[in-house]
């Protein structure tokens, strides 16, 4: 229906409104001038000249309510809520019940400093046991290898071992090893399920995993398998001394992984790309931190195919860097320039590497080769001392197709005679250039020369530079034998999130008497520690729902934190969540983080913002932070406590009860946990905690309660297999909440006050909902510590309203079944002497429809419940929320901006929505007037639905597709470029999953598997305005008056506004829901990097280093039979099988 045009001085349409000029009317804007469609609300005092008109004699019956009227309505609402909560909530009665049962519990104190020091000491002891096991393994490995005698004629059948991939290959009839019949040397094992490993294992053997692109029958690999077999006895002895050990792993520099206990490899659906040398823990243990500049030749001589190889090579090179490293990437021809927005070295973290990888794809070949420009740029980058960097190994990695210039003058100026910067050169592609200059550059600067003729050589040749960096470490001997602990990452064998202690293993052999000692690293020894094992050392339930322990490393990344919950993990990358991203960042937390990284002790009480568990709300709270370093590690431990969690209750079942040797099920209060009592005492949900070792967990609370009761039939109160603190507190709270039913709830008529349920939840893990039938619609988490209403009630004074949550699809609520309710809860504060604590939360569940009607009555001018106000034609009345709901909008909105109640019947099914989705203009006005403020943050642990592939029907990414004319051109087929392309096509088809998808696709196809992504979150919370406030939403003829006032002792805002009668003033909506984001602008973030410290040890130089071994190529000699068969397979459309390649260099002879 069209809206009638409005004119200045005219009354608003409709019979019920008083005649008055429209706010905002005045002289008509001149030609070419446009009145703004919306603007900030104006305070009502600006309209004082108009107020006489609002009540002019002879006007229509109703006017916009006065401020004192709306304040009166607000007081009535406050009194009604307070009255219901006093009668049914039972806060005071529950306090009395606790005091009446004072003999059944003790009040214990959390002493932050003692507590955090104890936990830090326990973690130190745990890790120290792993360190001792690591040292035994590393020493044994070095001795075994030193005693080993190299065998040139060793054969596969001479070596017996368990091939971890054998079972998967036997199940695959097309496997290369099945075809070659080489299983004679492979053991077949039986396995048993072990919950500690989340896997089936065999404790009598270790397993061996060899990368797909390494030929397991090569002499180097067979000798490696031969001498590492002796490690199995050391693995077993370590486990005998420490049964809690998890995976013990030796990652060899040849690519062989031997791990204990044996378990079948988790083979992916595509080609298995696992190579231990590319794992974060191996890279960290094999070398010291790096400052790396990658320079890429993009001159015109770099053909399309060669440039594609370079791009892929750079991306693979970036994957060998960790968060302790710094990097920049530049392209060069006549000039050098960075490929991205980064103008200096930046930390090689996941997000920065992503920027590089995307920027590298945009490189274009043109111009002429200018090595001098590229090297001068790289040396300038490394000499820049005004930025944060690793300050250890310095290196330049140059990718080129070849050239004649040796740029000796550049090296003389920047690097000689000390040669502090290593130069690694990479000849990329098939070409006829003289590679002598590239070899000379590498050899003259303590580096190495590599060849990458085709795609299959990329992985091996972009990681072997680590051998060179490991030389000073090997030559340093015992000084370099220091255990390092990694970032958090995802275990490849399914253990979940782990950290790994690493220790390098050195080659102690000498070529002969008086000869120089060997300077090759043999590999890295590693022992995993599951994060869950560390968490078990921290207090779980004595800190309360909002207290927690956290730990960070030298990068500020969290090792422990309740918000460390990655929804997906990238197999190839560590899980790096900064402490300031795990919480809402502020200056106080920056200071705490810096102090922890510096290894200091400290304590600080701060006011800070916290995000609710459901991520819909923000609360400003007080928190006490206490922190200490964990000795012998790079970690620091912190403890966070709210002031009300300084004390906690500990059940003290009397001697008489404990002397009863009958099962716990015979104790008095236990009967109130039985379902048979629910009808009279209300339904009980128990938190799914680890009360006893033999208790079977279940996501279904009814099933869990059943399991719990069955176990209690067998367990006595002092059983050693149970956690007495948890168990006794559960039974104590069962009895206390039952007394609340008996004293308060049972004798009250909930229907009188339109209540669907009353409830109580406790620190002890009990949630009691009354009456029993209300449990059918109870959707809150049975673990109070994981329930948003529980945690928010503890942090807020007064009554916390929680409307039903509506999902992002904006489906309306279903009101037909009369079970949609609004939770109102409050914490029970208990004072015992001078000790104050909050051991429980109580509340009610309001019937939405009934309370919406009640809301209209309370916000009306009725003088009696059943007597509406009367206004004659000559009398003046103010509009109210009941009689004038067609003209007046009245709502209650909570502190997050979500609709709680409305006087508009059509809005009842929108309760729980963000109010901007209900009335965008009004919500914007509230925000602009500081009733609400906004907090934006990023969730770096989100999971997003898979994006539809953008290259369906195309050739594998990075592969050049020749034209028909090329195929018909004989000269093209005989050229070196054609041969190079053919190799590229073959290896691209065989191994293209290296570049198409992440190896983690083992668990699902890319079409169905969620991927890690960044989501931008926006939450709203109450601003600085506490008083009653009147304003106008100025929008010309669509202007609206509104009034807003906070309700005392609640998290509600009472808003009264004129309803909009036209839509021409639609303003931009405030958004609250999560949105997909690229995160903050990385180019800006690197200009103000967060504080961090690198490892305190650095091995980048040793005067005895032998740099004569400085270069060789690695190409794959083609087999005519293989190539012909692969071509036939391609023509027939059959998928080719990868052929074994010897990717272990001769220098690896051990």
From Swiss-Prot:
Cellular compartments per GO CC: GABA-ergic synapse; plasma membrane; presynaptic active zone membrane; voltage-gated calcium channel complex
Motif placement: MIDAS-like motif: 297-301
Post-translational modification: May be proteolytically processed into subunits alpha-2-2 and delta-2 that are disulfide-linked. It is however unclear whether such cleavage really takes place in vivo and has a functional role.
Tissues and organs where the protein is expressed, per its UniProt entry: Predominantly present in cerebellar cortex. Present in various lung tumor cell lines, while it is absent in normal lung (at protein level). Highly expressed in heart, lung, testis, pancreas and skeletal muscle. Also expressed in kidney, liver, placenta and brain.
Keywords for this protein: Calcium, Calcium channel, Calcium transport, Disease variant, Disulfide bond, Epilepsy, Glycoprotein, Ion channel, Ion transport, Membrane, Metal-binding, Signal, Transmembrane, Transmembrane helix, Transport, Voltage-gated channel
Family matches, as Pfam families: VGCC_alpha2 (PF08473), VWA (PF00092), VWA_N (PF08399)
Protein's job: The alpha-2/delta subunit of voltage-dependent calcium channels regulates calcium current density and activation/inactivation kinetics of the calcium channel. Acts as a regulatory subunit for P/Q-type calcium channel (CACNA1A), N-type (CACNA1B), L-type (CACNA1C OR CACNA1D) and possibly T-type (CACNA1G). Overexpression induces apoptosis.
This protein's name: Voltage-dependent calcium channel subunit alpha-2/delta-2
Organism the protein comes from: Homo sapiens
């Amino acid at each position: 229906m069209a809206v009638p045009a409005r004119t200045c001085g005219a009354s608003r349409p409709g019979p019920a409104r008083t005649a008055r000029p429209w706010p905002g009317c005045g002289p008509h804007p001149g030609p070419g001038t446009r009145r703004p469609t919306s603007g900030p609300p104006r305070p009502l005092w600006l309209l004082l000249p108009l107020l006489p008109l609002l009540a002019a004699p002879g006007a229509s019956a109703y006017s916009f309510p006065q401020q004192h009227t709306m304040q009166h309505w607000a007081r009535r609402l406050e009194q009604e809520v307070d009255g219901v909560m006093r009668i049914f909530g039972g806060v005071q009665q529950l306090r009395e019940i606790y005091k009446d049962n004072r003999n059944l519990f003790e009040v214990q104190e959390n002493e932050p400093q003692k507590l955090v020091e104890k936990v830090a000491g326990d973690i130190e002891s745990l890790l120290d046991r792993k360190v001792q096991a690591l040292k035994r393994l590393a020493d044994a490995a070095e001795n075994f290898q030193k005693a080993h005698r190299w065998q040139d004629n060793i054969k596969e059948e001479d070596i017996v071992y368990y091939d971890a991939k054998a079972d998967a290959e036997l199940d695959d009839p097309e496997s290369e090893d099945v075809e070659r019949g080489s299983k004679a040397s492979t053991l077949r094992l039986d396995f048993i399920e072990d919950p500690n490993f989340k896997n089936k294992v065999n404790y009598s053997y270790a397993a061996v995993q060899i990368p797909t692109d390494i030929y397991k029958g090569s002499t180097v690999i067979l000798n490696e398998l031969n001498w590492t077999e002796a490690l199995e006895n050391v693995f077993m002895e370590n486990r005998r001394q420490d049964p809690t050990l998890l995976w013990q792993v030796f990652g060899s520099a040849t690519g062989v992984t031997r791990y204990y206990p044996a378990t079948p490899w988790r083979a992916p659906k595509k080609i298995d790309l696992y190579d231990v040398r590319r794992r974060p823990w191996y890279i960290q243990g094999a070398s010291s931190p790096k400052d790396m500049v990658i320079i890429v030749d993009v001159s015109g001589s770099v053909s399309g195919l060669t440039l594609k190889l370079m791009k892929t090579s750079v991306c693979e090179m970036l994957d060998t860097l960790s968060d302790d490293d710094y990097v920049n990437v530049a392209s060069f021809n006549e000039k050098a320039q960075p490929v991205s927005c980064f103008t200096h070295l930046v930390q090689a973290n996941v997000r920065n590497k992503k920027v590089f990888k995307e920027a590298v794809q945009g490189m274009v070949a043109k111009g002429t080769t200018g090595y001098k420009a590229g090297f001068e740029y790289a040396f300038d980058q490394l000499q820049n001392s005004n930025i944060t960097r690793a300050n250890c190994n310095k290196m330049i990695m140059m990718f080129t197709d070849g050239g004649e210039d040796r740029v000796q003058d550049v090296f003389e100026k920047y690097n000689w005679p000390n040669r502090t910067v290593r130069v690694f050169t990479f000849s990329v592609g098939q070409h006829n250039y003289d590679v002598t200059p590239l070899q000379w550059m590498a050899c003259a600067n303590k580096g190495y020369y590599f060849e990458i003729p085709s795609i299959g050589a990329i992985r091996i040749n972009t990681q072997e530079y680590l051998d060179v960096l490991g030389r000073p470490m090997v030559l340093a001997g015992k000084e370099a034998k220091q255990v390092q602990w990694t970032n958090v990452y995802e275990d490849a064998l399914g253990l979940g999130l782990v950290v790994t202690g690493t220790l390098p293993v050195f080659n102690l052999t000498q070529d002969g008497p008086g000869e120089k000692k060997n300077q090759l690293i043999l590999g890295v020894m590693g022992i995993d520690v599951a994060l869950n094992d560390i968490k078990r050392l921290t207090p779980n339930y004595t800190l309360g729902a909002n207290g927690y322990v956290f730990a960070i490393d030298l990068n500020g990344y969290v090792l422990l934190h309740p918000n460390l919950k990655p929804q997906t993990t990238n197999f190839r990358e560590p899980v790096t969540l900064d402490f300031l991203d795990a919480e809402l960042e502020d200056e106080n937390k920056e200071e705490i983080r810096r102090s922890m990284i510096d290894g200091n002790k400290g304590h600080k009480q701060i006011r800070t913002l916290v995000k609710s568990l459901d991520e819909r709300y923000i609360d400003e709270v007080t928190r006490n932070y206490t922190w200490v370093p964990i000795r012998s590690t790079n970690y620091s431990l912190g403890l966070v406590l709210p002031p009300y969690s300084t004390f906690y209750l500990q059940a003290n079942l009397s001697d008489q009860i404990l002397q009863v040797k009958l099962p716990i099920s015979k104790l008095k209060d236990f009967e109130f946990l039985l379902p048979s009592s629910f009808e009279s005492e209300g339904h009980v949900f128990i938190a799914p905690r680890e009360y006893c070792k033999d208790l079977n967990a279940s996501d279904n609370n009814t099933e869990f309660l059943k399991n719990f009761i069955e176990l209690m039939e067998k367990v006595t109160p002092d059983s050693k297999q149970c956690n007495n603190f948890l168990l006794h507190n559960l039974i104590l709270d069962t009895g206390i909440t039952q007394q609340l039913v008996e004293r308060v709830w049972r004798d009250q008529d909930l229907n009188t006050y339109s209540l669907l349920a009353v409830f109580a939840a406790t620190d002890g893990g009990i949630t009691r909902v009354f009456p029993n039938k209300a449990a059918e619609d109870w959707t809150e988490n049975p673990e109070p510590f994981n329930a948003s209403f529980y945690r928010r009630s503890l942090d807020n004074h007064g009554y916390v309203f929680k409307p039903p949550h509506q999902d992002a699809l904006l489906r309306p609520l279903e009101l037909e079944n009369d079970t949609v309710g609004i939770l109102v809860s409050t914490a029970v504060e208990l004072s015992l002497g001078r000790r104050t604590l909050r051991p429980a939360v109580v509340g009610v569940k309001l019937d939405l429809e009934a309370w919406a009607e009640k809301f209209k009555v309370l916000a009306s001018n009725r003088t009696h419940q059943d007597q509406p106000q009367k206004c004659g034609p000559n009398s003046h009345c103010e509009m109210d929320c009941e009689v004038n709901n067609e003209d007046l909008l009245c709502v209650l909105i909570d502190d997050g901006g979500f609709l709680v109640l409305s006087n508009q019947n059509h809005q009842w099914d929108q309760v729980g929505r963000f109010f901007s989705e209900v009335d965008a203009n009004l919500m914007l006005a509230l925000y602009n007037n500081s009733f609400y403020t906004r907090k934006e943050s990023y969730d770096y642990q989100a999971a997003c639905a898979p994006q539809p592939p953008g290259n369906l029907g195309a050739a594998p990414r990075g592969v050049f597709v020749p034209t028909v004319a090329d195929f018909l051109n004989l000269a093209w087929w005989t050229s070196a470029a054609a041969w190079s392309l053919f190799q590229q096509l073959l290896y691209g088809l065989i191994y293209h999953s290296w570049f198409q998808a992440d190896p983690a696709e083992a668990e699902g196809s890319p079409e169905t598997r969620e991927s890690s992504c960044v989501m931008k979150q926006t939450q709203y919370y109450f601003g600085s305005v506490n008083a009653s406030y009147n304003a106008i939403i100025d929008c010309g003829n669509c202007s609206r008056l509104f009034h807003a006032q906070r309700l005392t002792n609640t998290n509600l805002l009472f808003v009264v506004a004129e309803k909009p009668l036209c839509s021409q003033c639609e303003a931009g909506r405030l958004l609250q829901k999560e949105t997909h984001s690229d995160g903050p602008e990385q180019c800006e973030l690197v200009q103000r990097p967060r504080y961090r410290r690198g490892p305190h040890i650095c091995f980048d130089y040793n005067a005895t280093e032998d740099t004569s071994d400085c270069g060789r190529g690695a190409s794959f000699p083609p087999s005519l039979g293989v190539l012909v068969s692969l071509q036939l397979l391609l023509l027939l459309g059959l998928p080719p099988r990868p052929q074994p390649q010897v990717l272990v260099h001769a220098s690896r002879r051990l």
